[in-house]
Structures are given as C-alpha cells and as structure tokens.
Design a protein with these regions (language model features):
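N-terminal maturation segment of proteins
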Residues: 1-563
C-alpha cells in the first residue's frame, strides 16, 4: 500500500486538530495535545461545539474527490461517524449521558491514570487539572439539568450507581488522594506538594457536590425503567457497530450461539472431571485448583505481564508481523476499584506504551488464571494492543483521525473477541482449564447479545430464561436479566453486578463484541473461500495485516473495504 497525503487527509487532520482544541483530555490521551493543564468543557455550549464542527467537516468533504482507496475509506468512515454524531446530538443523547462506566465523571477520574508523572512540569499539569475538576463537573451538571428540563434523564439505577462512584471519589479511597500522596511526589518542591494536596481536596469536594446533585436533584426526576426502547436502541446499536442490524434476527442468533457454546463447555467439563459433572460444577472446581490461582495484586500483575510478553514473542513473525514499538505492553493495576479490565492505547510517539489495566474490586485477593488468560489475549496481543497500536503506528498510511479518533466498538471489541477465539484455534488455549475460560468469555458475550436486546427493546423472556428458578414468563427486566447472567456466566458477584449495571446503562455496546466477532469471522472465511475458488493459498497473516491496516471503522465500511 502506498498512499500520498491528500486533500481528504488534510480535512481529516484539520478535524482532529480542532477536536483536540475542544478536548484537551483527548489531546492528552492521544499524545497530540498541547494543553495539559485543563479539562474539557462538558456544558451544553461545549458539547454543541462538536456538532458544529461535525457539520462543517461534512460540508468540506462534499467538496473534495477521493484520490484512491485509502481516501474512499476515510470519506465513508467520516460520513458514517460524523453523521451519526449529529443524529445523536439532535436526539439530546450527549446532554443526558450518564452511566456507571462511560460518562463524564468516569472520563475525568480515569484521565489522571494516564497522565505522565516524570517531571515537575508533569506534576504542575496534574495540579492544574485537579483544580479544574470543579469547573468540568459543573459543566456536566449544566448539561444534565438542560436534558432533565426536556424530560430526558438516565434511569434511576444509573443515577444511583454514578452517585455511589462519586461519593467514593470524594472519600478516603479516592484515586485523587492516592495520586497526590504517592512516593513520586516526595521529591517535589513543598509549595507544589501543598498545592497538589489542596487541589486534590477541591477535586474530591467537587465529586461530593456532584453526588449530592445526583441524589437530591436528578434522582427524583429519574424513572425506574432500565430499557430505552427500540427507537433509541437502534440508534445506539448503529453507534457501536457502524452498521444497521436486524435486531430480532441478531437476538435469535445470540440464543443459538449461546446454546452452541454451552454444548462445548459441557464437553470440556466432561474431559476435565468425568461424566455427570455440570459446567457450573466444573467452573467451581477450577476456581479451587491452586495451579490456576494468583494471590495478591503483585502476583496478578507479574502473571499478566509474563502472559502478555509470551504472546508477543510467540505470535510475531508467525501469524502476525508486530512492529518493534508494539512489542512492549505494560500491565498495570488501576487505582480505581470498579471491577473492570481495560486497555489504553499508546501515545502518538510511543513514549507512553499501550497499557492493560485491571481495576480490582476492594477485598478481592485471589485471581483465577484459567478464567483470565483469555482476557490478556483480548486486551493485549493479538487483541486491542495490536489493533490500536497498529493504528497509531501507521502514520504514513493513515491520517490523524483514522489513527487516533475513529473508534468503533463493533470493530475493536469484535476484533478482540475474534483474537480470543483465534488464540484457542492456534493452540494457545489447549489446557482444558484455559479453554473453559475462553469459552466462558465467549459465553458472556453471547449472553450479552440476548440480554441487551431483550431488556432494551422490551422483549418477552425466552423459554430458557422463563424456566430458571424464580423467573417465569413476562418481559425482560433487571431481575430476570440478573438470573440469566448468573446462570450463564462464571464471574465473581462484584464483577457481575458491575457488568449488569453497565449493560442497563450503556445500551447497544455489550452486543458489539459478539456481533463484531461474527462479522470478522465472516469476512475472514469469505476471503479464504475466495482464495480457494481462485486456486490460491490463503495466508492468515496477510489477511490480518491487510485488515488491521484499515484501522477502526464501522463494520459496514470494513466489509466494503476488504471486499
């Protein structure tokens, strides 16, 4: 592939620069920004600026013709993404956005995990940003108030969840407090240390005020219904997939997929422990096996790092070509304790490597590797680290927008789930315990498809759900979703509770994993079949290289680009 910078690239790069101007937080997370001492403007005026920029950029794209296939993908992807952003803004979604995992209060809190702490200037920037938390959350409150005045308020369950997180951030377990009292601050000038402490206290107080606003002002206006309805759900589904799917067909496919995975797990349970041992019993026994246990976060971190490094070494040059900057991944324990596991991409110059984070719930001290080995492949190589790292690495082929700003869950999470199954197919999960963990991960994602569409579109409970103890017939709701989840997924209750709240508050995102994997496997199989028809040898490594070189785009755009 050889692509010369074009007029289309110039528009995309200009758009990226303007987004980073509007969002210093995005500038810091990508490594492209110059302002590292302020947070974003989350007020209605601040949010509207993005919509104006989207409209202006789409108008510019209409005036320029693509010069090659790379340009064609850029134009198609930008029209799809920016057009959808405008639709979401028209519907008031950015103003009302509030959930337990991906809304403003978490974005502000988690940004501080990414900020450099090497120099005095780095700490001065952190200090300034801590002092800016009050203003940033104040803008968010303005937006939530405006949405509420229009009758648009998140479900009460999400308001309560975020209020709980905000109280936590205001209290003694605050990540702000941990940050400014870390050993690294001891070498700083006393005046800066004092200011850091004062601004951390201010940031904590801002979260306390935010929690109070949520509980006293927003919660009384919030409804108890978790489902968002078919119309809103279809819009969210497009946001996370970059494709329009048949929700009813996908729901039935999810049920079938879940049944197939269950059959696989039953067979593994039999191989592990003999006839008559159920999947649930096998999972319980695996948890009790010392060979699959890590004790304490230090041991967990070491195991994560060793597993991730082994995957890089074993896959490079065989099934993937991994550029040198991507051969480094850093495994970290997150300062927060939400129960999530996530990846943050490298900075533009790779001075900050890609990182895998484990946010360990308070009180959790034993970690089961049979269940989490597949997660390391999902977040690391060949999952998110390879995919997002390649996007950053391909500076000569992809413009700034495609390298840094375009992220579609169905593409990205679909790839990471595809990577999990691929690692099993390549022999990395032949240990029966590890294989059970991979299948359990696949089962979770298939269950999400059924649960998410079921709850949010108000479907009747399927027979397999209605038959569970204490459930019965009726429409999907939180309690039946919990029964479905606990029946289908082997995770600690703290993790599962967070997961369910996430599905209820972030409609359309959870199915993107399995639906995205479905498309990735379909595209790969189509490419292999085409090669066979033409009498050519199919190279999986070449397919992966070509697919990852496109970067993260909507699934409809990806299929078109690879066909």
């Amino acid at each position: 592939m050889s692509h010369k910078p074009s007029a289309i690239d110039a528009i995309a790069n200009e758009y990226t620069a303007k987004v980073i101007e509007l969002s210093p937080m995005t500038g810091s997370s990508t490594g492209l920004g110059e302002r590292h001492d302020v947070l974003d403007d989350f007020s209605p005026e601040g949010l509207n600026a993005y919509t104006q920029l989207d409209r202006e950029t789409l108008a510019k794209l209409d005036e320029v013709a693509p010069t090659d296939a790379v340009d064609e993908v850029t134009v198609a992807a930008m029209r799809e993404r920016l057009g959808l952003s405008i639709e979401l803004a028209k519907a008031g979604e950015p103003l009302r956005n509030l959930n337990n995992i991906a809304s403003t209060s978490q974005d502000i809190r988690d940004l501080f995990d990414l900020l450099p702490t090497e120099s005095e200037q780095d700490w001065a920037n952190i200090c300034a940003r801590l002092g800016d938390v009050k203003r940033a959350l104040g803008g968010h409150v303005e937006s939530l108030r405006l949405a509420a005045s229009r009758g648009q308020v998140a479900a009460a369950r999400q308001v309560r969840a975020v209020a709980g997180q905000a109280h936590n951030q205001a209290g003694e377990s605050s990540s702000f407090l941990a940050l400014v009292s870390s050993p690294e601050t001891q070498s700083l000038p006393e005046s800066l240390r004092k200011e850091l402490a004062a601004n951390a206290a201010s940031a904590q107080a801002a979260y306390g005020d935010f929690a109070n606003f949520l509980e006293t002002e927003l919660l009384p206006q919030a409804g108890e219904q978790d489902g968002v309805g078919r119309e809103r759900y279809q819009l969210f589904s497009r946001e996370f997939l970059g494709a329009t799917i048949d929700l009813d067909e996908t729901y039935e496919w999810g049920r079938e997929r879940l049944a197939a995975i269950d059959a696989e797990q039953r067979e593994v349970a039999r191989e592990l422990y003999g006839d008559g041992v159920s999947v649930q019993e096998a999972l319980k026994r695996l948890d009790e096996e010392p060979r699959y246990q890590q004790h304490g976060t230090d041991a967990l971190k070491k195991w994560m790092q060793e597993t991730a490094d082994a995957a890089v070494a074993g896959l490079n040059g065989t099934h993937f070509d991994i550029p040198a900057p991507l051969q480094r991944i850093e495994c970290c324990i997150a300062p927060s304790s939400t129960g999530g596991i996530y990846y943050t991409g490298p900075s533009d110059d790779f001075s900050r490597p890609g990182r895998m984070w484990w946010s360990v719930p308070a009180g959790t001290t034993v970690f089961n590797t049979w269940q989490e080995r597949t997660t390391v492949f999902h977040e690391g190589v060949p999952g998110h680290h390879l995919q997002l790292g390649m996007q950053t690495y391909l500076r000569d082929e992809l413009n700034d927008w495609r390298r840094h700003l375009c992220w579609v869950s169905g593409h990205g999470e679909g790839w990471a789930l595809y990577a999990e199954r691929l690692m099993a197919d390549l022999g990395w999960q032949d240990d029966l315990g590890d294989r059970m963990g991979m299948l359990d991960s696949q089962r979770l994602r298939a269950a999400r498809v059924v649960l998410d569409i079921g709850v949010h579109t108000g479907k009747q409970r399927p027979a397999e759900l209605a038959a569970l103890p204490g459930v019965g017939e009726g429409k999907w709701d939180r309690d039946s979703a919990w029964a479905y989840l606990t029946h289908n997924v082997a995770m600690a209750e703290g993790f599962l509770s967070f997961e369910l709240e996430r599905y209820l508050g972030w409609p359309g995102q959870a199915p993107a994993y399995a639906v995205g994997q479905r498309l990735w496997e379909s595209i790969r199989d189509d490419a292999a079949a085409k090669a066979a028809r033409e009498g050519k040898e199919f190279s999986l490594k070449e397919f992966h290289s070509r697919a990852l070189a496109i970067g993260s785009v909507g699934l409809d755009v990806l299929r078109e680009a690879l066909s």
